Amino acid sequence: MRLSYRLVSGLLVLASIVGMSFALYLEHVKGLEPCPLCIFQRVGLMAMGFVALIAFLHNPVSNAIKRFYAFLAGVAILWSVGVAGRHVWLQHLPPDQVPSCGPGLNYLIDALPMKTVLQEVLSGSGECAAIDWTFLGQSLPVWSLAYFLLLLLVCLWQLFRFYPVFKTAKK
């Protein structure tokens, strides 16, 4: 069975919706407060979903445009992979090396320039090292990293897979 570009783009949109729905479920139903790194992971997931939605709706014929959309989606989810990897690393630091807790993300955004906010958030804080939820012995950032890596593989497959070239008939 050959998976069409549009079908895979639709599956990426669906995967983004599922991931965000689960994150919002954990936040609003289970009461888990997302740390700044969690929020940044969501941004990458939503950006990938947005690019995939545009690709799904546009359904380009040009292979170059298909690859461009796949590249943009891959870059977006690569952001989430990087942030989730940093999050996992912070959670595995020895307790004496965990950074102290910093101010909340809303305060940082209101008080500091965006470049400084990015530096502060990506350096992590003590709240990001706390493990509040586990499944099968793994923390939420580990599961998020695995999910994002799977989505990155799909984006890379979309980027590098063979697309048949359709030649138009001459009249």
Curated annotation (Swiss-Prot):
Keywords: Cell inner membrane, Cell membrane, Chaperone, Disulfide bond, Electron transport, Membrane, Oxidoreductase, Redox-active center, Transmembrane, Transmembrane helix, Transport. Residues 26-43, 86-142 are periplasmic. The gene is dsbB. HAMAP family: DsbB. This is Disulfide bond formation protein B. Disulfide bonds join C35-C38, C101-C128. Its main location: membrane. It comes from the Bacteria.
